[in-house]
Curated annotation (Swiss-Prot):
The gene is rpsL. This is Small ribosomal subunit protein uS12. Keywords: Methylation, Ribonucleoprotein, Ribosomal protein, RNA-binding, rRNA-binding, tRNA-binding. Belongs to the universal ribosomal protein uS12 family. GO terms for cellular component: small ribosomal subunit. PROSITE patterns: RIBOSOMAL_S12 (PS00055). Residues 1-44 are annotated as: Disordered.
């Protein structure tokens, strides 16, 4: 525990909070080949690998994921939500932050219905989250 004198001299340091989606905090200047400070809510990227992985201990499934090289040249793993998808290698996708609790290392979500990613077919509820258009009457 610090003395009063130490607190007067140094003071308390406030904790710096870490970002949940660090890859969205950088841009890239291709002329200077340098990362720039350009935070964004979403980023575009190209899928370099699409596959399935198994979740952590109490759960059992084959969760779909895509390895994505973003426009700022950072490569991340993103979860593909919903039933069925049309992604393959070299598909252009839009990602947002948001981790998947039972998949280690997956801190991003692919946005359905944007760029090359199709919305979920036959989805009636929560359509906006899965990029599905309103069904015709």
């Amino acid at each position: 525990m610090p003395t009063i004198n130490q607190l007067v001299r140094k003071g308390r340091k406030s904790r710096t909070s870490k970002s949940d989606a660090p890859a969205l905090n950088f841009g890239y200047n291709s002329m200077k080949k340098k990362a720039t400070d350009n935070p964004a809510p979403q980023k575009r990227g190209v899928a370099t690998r699409v596959g399935t992985m198994t979740p952590k201990k109490p759960n059992s499934a084959l969760r779909k994921y895509a390895r994505v090289r973003l426009s700022n040249l950072i490569e991340v793993t993103a979860y593909i939500p919903g039933i069925g998808h049309n992604l393959q290698e070299h598909s252009v996708v839009l990602i947002r932050g948001g981790r998947v609790k039972d998949l280690p290392g997956v801190r991003y979500h692919v946005i359905r219905g944007a760029l090359d990613t199709a919305g979920v077919d036959g989805r009636m509820q929560s359509r906006s989250k899965y990029g599905t258009k309103r069904p015709k009457k």
